[in-house]
Amino acid sequence: MKVHVPVTLVMITLLAGCAAQQQSRREVQQNQQVLYMNETYETLNQNLEAEVKSDQVEVKQLKNRLQVTMVNEILFPEGGWEVGPHGIEVLMKVAPSLENLSGKRILVQGFTDNVPVDETLRTRFPTNWELSASRATNVVRHLQAQGIAPSTLAAEAFGEYHPIASNQTPEGRRKNRRINIVIEDEEM
């Protein structure tokens, strides 16, 4: 019995050391993730400085994720769904920050205002759901074309159902017509 006590104590000490080492690794990984998100936030703000100053783009650092919000007019022609030349330039400024992501996913979210889709487009987009989905998907395609791994990309459509401003004013509707690019942990 006396032999078992020292062996048990050695085992407990080893297990405690392993647990502490695993905790330390997790803390290092979390700190690296925070540093990565901070660096990405700073880079996005620098790359998009003109667009941020003109109130067309907003970069937010939220808990465990980053969000780049772009009003539609910077990406798409009036009433359009295909990324225009200026939109391609803006996405080229965003793409370098999205390369080489490890353990992250990129959600491209499309939103509209509550104005019904114009009659001329209703055969293609019966509702704002389809319009917001097409816009988000086109942004995903452009990011992929710029080298972003397709396995990290996803498109989401919200239509008119998540406004951030009142749809009663032109300025509110402008803010509601937007694309969000969200960078978050894969397991979220």
Model regions and ranges:
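Envelope-exposed proteins and targeting segments
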Residues: 53-55, 62-66, 70-72, 79, ...
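Bacterial N-terminal signal peptides that target proteins for export
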Residues: 1-7
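Short, charged, surface-exposed interaction patches
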Residues: 56, 62-75, 106, 110-121, ...
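Bacterial signal peptide processing site
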Residues: 19-22
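Periplasmic OmpA-like peptidoglycan-binding domain that tethers envelope proteins to the cell wall
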Residues: 80-81, 85, 111-188
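C-terminal motif of bacterial Sec signal peptides marking the signal peptidase cleavage site
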Residues: 14-17
